[in-house]
Amino acid sequence: MKIILANPRGFCAGVDRAISIVELALEIHGAPIYVRHEVVHNRFVVNGLRERGAIFVEELSEVPDGAIVIFSAHGVSQAVRQEAKDRNLKVFDATCPLVTKVHMQVARASRKGTKAILIGHKGHPEVEGTMGQYSNEDGGIFLIEKVEDIARLPMQENDNLTFMTQTTLSLDDTAETIAALKEKYPAIQGPHKNDICYATTNRQEAVRELAKLSDLVLVVGSKNSSNSNRLAELASRMGVKSQLLDEPADIQADWFNDVKTIGITAGASAPEELGQSIISRLKRFGANSIEELQGLEGNMFFEVPKELRIKEVN
């Protein structure tokens, strides 16, 4: 069997920054460091940070007063920020800057009293944080996941409306939903460019090319990773078998029946070393050659907070 690697795959700049913030906080301040929610949605990464002294919690009520807490890459609501301030918690914010950009759009709509529509997945921490930027009772923010949800929106055609999206959605599904929104609300405003981030976009485009060449597409990523799930769904939509896997032990022999070419990609929160360990396991199942596709090389970089830059600390 032949292995073809998608390009780009794996860590994006926002994930890289978030992990670095936890690592640097541990290095400078020592354990324990509290992290609200999994800093990124990857079990391998989270377990590694936990072993080094990070304590992952879901609510700030689990964090002692005055302790250091890190907000995950997915962002948090204004209410969570205020709670941290009220309790004198030392906060390092690992929110991806591209998520912060969406937060600013929502906050702007809230200040103006413009009703906002967020396209995203209910219950996802990024969505909860984004919804929590809106506080104006004279307006409102409404969540939709798919085209069918639009019919249930309470707004009128001539209402002052704006929309924004979660950063890790399917490009195809989101384009369809935005088109339907604009059809129902012709005057609705939105970002000049959709909010789906560069890493999500590039990785989905890479999977399109990968699926054309593969009998099976393996996506390295955790089940709670939105962008990883979208990659697996896209491959399936293109008529190729796909599997989402968290670690080498997830691999099953019957996946490879009638498979000559295996395509491999990785979600934006999956480290390269995990991908390499999966490739090593695939060799035991008969994979004997590896090819990497050409693709858009990521050159985006997001700086960590000033207080965590080692040279400036020293």
Swiss-Prot record:
Active site per database record: E126
Pfam families: LYTB
GO biological process per UniProt: dimethylallyl diphosphate biosynthetic process; isopentenyl diphosphate biosynthetic process, methylerythritol 4-phosphate pathway; terpenoid biosynthetic process
Cofactor(s) it depends on: [4Fe-4S] cluster
Pathway in which this enzyme or protein is active: Isoprenoid biosynthesis; dimethylallyl diphosphate biosynthesis; dimethylallyl diphosphate from (2E)-4-hydroxy-3-methylbutenyl diphosphate: step 1/1; Isoprenoid biosynthesis; isopentenyl diphosphate biosynthesis via DXP pathway; isopentenyl diphosphate from 1-deoxy-D-xylulose 5-phosphate: step 6/6
GO cellular component: cytosol
Keyword line: 4Fe-4S, Iron, Iron-sulfur, Isoprene biosynthesis, Metal-binding, Oxidoreductase
UniProt binding sites for (2E)-4-hydroxy-3-methylbut-2-enyl diphosphate: H41, H74, H124, T167, S225, S226, N227, S269
Residues holding isopentenyl diphosphate: H41, H74, H124, S225, S226, N227, S269
UniProt cofactor note: Binds 1 [4Fe-4S] cluster per subunit.
Binding site for [4Fe-4S] cluster: C12, C96, C197
Enzyme class: oxidoreductase
Keyword Repressor: no
Molecular-function GO term, any one: 4 iron, 4 sulfur cluster binding
EC number of this enzyme: 1.17.7.4
Residues that coordinate or bind dimethylallyl diphosphate: H41, H74, H124, S225, S226, N227, S269
UniProt-listed InterPro entries: LytB/IspH (IPR003451)
Function: Catalyzes the conversion of 1-hydroxy-2-methyl-2-(E)-butenyl 4-diphosphate (HMBPP) into a mixture of isopentenyl diphosphate (IPP) and dimethylallyl diphosphate (DMAPP). Acts in the terminal step of the DOXP/MEP pathway for isoprenoid precursor biosynthesis.
UniProt xrefs under PANTHER family: 4-HYDROXY-3-METHYLBUT-2-ENYL DIPHOSPHATE REDUCTASE
Family note: Belongs to the IspH family.
Name of the protein described by the UniProt record: 4-hydroxy-3-methylbut-2-enyl diphosphate reductase
Lineage: Bacteria, Pseudomonadati, Pseudomonadota, Gammaproteobacteria, Pasteurellales
Gene that encodes it: ispH
